[in-house]
Amino acid sequence: MYPVDLHMHTVASTHAYSTLSDYIAEAKRKGIKLFAITDHGPDMEDAPHHWHFINMRIWPRLVDGVGILRGIEANIKNINGEIDCSGKMFDSLDLIIAGFHELVFAPHDKETNTQAMIATIASGKVHIISHPGNPKYPVEVKAVAQAAAKHHVALEINNSSFLHSRKGSEDNCRAVAAAVRDAGGWVALGSDSHTAFTLGDFTECRKILDAVDFPEDRILNVSPQRLLSFLESRGMAPVPEFAEL
């Protein structure tokens, strides 16, 4: 459906089941041109050590025509928008996703959740907010979408939220998509794969986007070039190997 997937986990997050090589093979099979590995930040109980993220610099950029982005799904830690990504980790990473996870930041009231999410957006350290429609973390959706548009941060529609986790996300995600549409911001689609078999599956995301008539020209996954232009506008140095994507 789209040639870019921006959210997935490998065996480095020990509740996931596929390797980098598994994802490359599945990307080739499905025609995915560019994907980001985004294992959980180190404050999660079963997450990789911070050296895992620093050492991503040894990865090839391109394997058999498939581009690989070095990423993290960091954890929002507090109302000040601090995340568990710092120092040399930033030097090795292309894509910083951040979101709420109960083991790191327990659910709070809507005002507190909103304060934490907007502070994270405004920090300048994050490219995408993961699963902002999670019903366990109610937020002021309009305010979050406006902040995201202002700071050039995408809000994610997460396919896994409608299948395996975060039950009851549908209404919230429709509200998120509509608010991003009205604010003129960006949406990022993530399979949130924990196994390579679901790489590039945005079937449920598409239903959400269609329900609110979301414009294609505000979806980062439409092409590698669009996603890379977005990242470069946020300060990522151009990657010569990606020119052929």
Swiss-Prot record:
Residues annotated as binding Zn(2+) 1 are: 7, 9, 73, 192
Which residues are noted in the entry as Zn(2+) 2-binding? Answer: 15, 40, 194
- Required co-factor? Zn(2+)
Q: How does the cofactor attach, per the note?
A: Binds 3 Zn(2+) ions per subunit.
- According to its UniProt record, the EC number is 3.1.3.-
The top EC class, named as a word, is: hydrolase
Biological processes annotated in GO? bacterial-type flagellum-dependent swarming motility
Q: Per the record's keyword annotation, is Metal-binding included, yes or no?
A: yes
What keyword terms does UniProt attach to this protein? Hydrolase, Metal-binding, Zinc
Task: Enumerate the residues binding Zn(2+) 3.
Answer: 73, 101, 131
Identify a single GO molecular function assigned to this protein. Answer: phosphatase activity
Q: Which SUPFAM superfamilies match?
A: PHP domain-like (SSF89550)
Instruction: Look up keyword Hydrolase and say if it applies.
Output: yes
What InterPro entries would the database entry show? Answer: Phosphatase_YcdX_put, PHP_dom, PHP_phosphatase, Pol/His_phosphatase_N, Pol/histidinol_Pase-like
Gene Ontology CC entries for this record = cytosol
Q: Which family does it belong to?
A: Belongs to the PHP family.
Q: Which PANTHER family match?
A: PHOSPHATASE YCDX-RELATED (PTHR36928:SF1)
| Summary of subunit composition and partner proteins | Homotrimer.
Q: Which HAMAP family match?
A: YcdX_phosphat
Designated name of the protein: Probable phosphatase YcdX
Q: Which organism is it from?
A: Salmonella arizonae (strain ATCC BAA-731 / CDC346-86 / RSK2980)
